[in-house]
């Protein structure tokens, strides 16, 4: 039995001038999602999706490469200005933001939406090195 040929879906070009970038930077990886104002995903990328493995995913350079890739995908849809929402304690926060500026986006606002507990769950134990 022959396999059916899988169809490649081509992304239709959406004309969206402004959007929101969600930068989720953890200790292990950096995920970047660009959405429209309603929250529908336009483009996404992560350090792991760019081929970085293991401890290299958590580096600022990996976050920069992921942000540049995501920005190019969003520019194909006609996006020019961005609001930035940064979440998490990771090392790729600032480098991802700088990469978005270097690609040529106009950044209108930067918000830190990292959740801070009002003495909620017990934190994990301290590392002793």
Swiss-Prot record:
GO CC terms, sorted: ribonucleoprotein complex; ribosome
Keyword ATP-binding: no
SUPFAM superfamilies: Translational machinery components
InterPro entries: Ribosomal_uS11, Ribosomal_uS11_bac-type, Ribosomal_uS11_CS, Ribosomal_uS11_sf
Keywords for the protein's UniProt record, in alphabetical order: Ribonucleoprotein, Ribosomal protein, RNA-binding, rRNA-binding
Keyword Chaperone: no
BP-aspect Gene Ontology terms: translation
Gene Ontology MF, one: structural constituent of ribosome
Known function: Located on the platform of the 30S subunit, it bridges several disparate RNA helices of the 16S rRNA. Forms part of the Shine-Dalgarno cleft in the 70S ribosome.
Subunit text: Part of the 30S ribosomal subunit. Interacts with proteins S7 and S18. Binds to IF-3.
Family membership: Belongs to the universal ribosomal protein uS11 family.
NCBIfam families: PRK05309.1, uS11_bact
HAMAP family found in the cross-reference section: Ribosomal_uS11 (MF_01310)
Identification of the protein by name: Small ribosomal subunit protein uS11
